[in-house]
Swiss-Prot record:
Keywords: Cytoplasm, Kinase, Metal-binding, Phosphoprotein, Phosphotransferase system, Sugar transport, Transferase, Transport, Zinc. The active site is at H83. The lineage of its organism: Bacteria, Pseudomonadati, Pseudomonadota, Gammaproteobacteria, Enterobacterales. Its cofactor is Zn(2+). It comes from Buchnera aphidicola subsp. Acyrthosiphon pisum (strain APS). This is PTS system glucose-specific EIIA component. The record marks H68 as: Important for phospho-donor activity.
Length: 161
């Protein structure tokens, strides 16, 4: 089999935008943990909306106590990590309101966290939000989207198994 037949016949998983805004290259995030892909590969979002939505059908793994980040595992075992902003852990949960809980089953578009975007913009180093695939080594190819995106509607990443 050729590369192309593998590619076109392989299973794919689509990751939807958890926030509305603009896609930024993960390499441009001002935190080396993300820009050097230490925790996985993906994209970042410069958000324009205040609701973080489930990007896949799956199960919430862990919502951090400070509510600035969470993990989610899709029904087909894609492990995602969504981290709102840079140094937002220092806000100790202020500006974030949890709408979901650990181990909760969710569908694409379900609310996970509500943000006070203006407050966080004022207090955080950056509001760029990395969306990374933690188990990226399990996939043959990653296709990243670009441009302006709508939460729960735009595919931001396509993974080929």
């Amino acid at each position: 089999m050729s590369f192309f037949s593998d590619f076109f016949n392989s299973k794919k998983t689509e990751i939807f935008a958890p926030l509305s805004g603009d896609i930024i290259n993960i390499e441009d995030v001002p935190d080396p943990v993300f820009s050097k892909k230490i925790v996985g590969d993906g994209i970042a979002i410069k958000p324009s909306s205040n609701r973080i939505l489930a990007p896949v059908n799956g199960t919430i793994g862990k919502i951090f106590e400070t509510m600035h980040a969470f993990s989610i595992i899709s029904e087909d075992n894609v492990e995602l990590f969504i981290h709102f902003g840079i140094d937002t852990v220092k806000l100790k949960g202020e500006g974030f309101k949890k709408k979901a809980k650990d181990n909760q089953k969710v569908k694409i578009g379900d609310e996970i966290i509500i943000l006070d975007l203006e407050f966080i913009k004022e207090k955080a180093e950056s509001i760029l939000t990395p969306v990374v695939i933690s188990n990226i080594e399990n996939f043959k190819k990653i296709k990243k989207s670009s441009g302006t995106i709508a939460a729960g509607q735009t595919v931001i990443i396509t993974l080929y198994h």
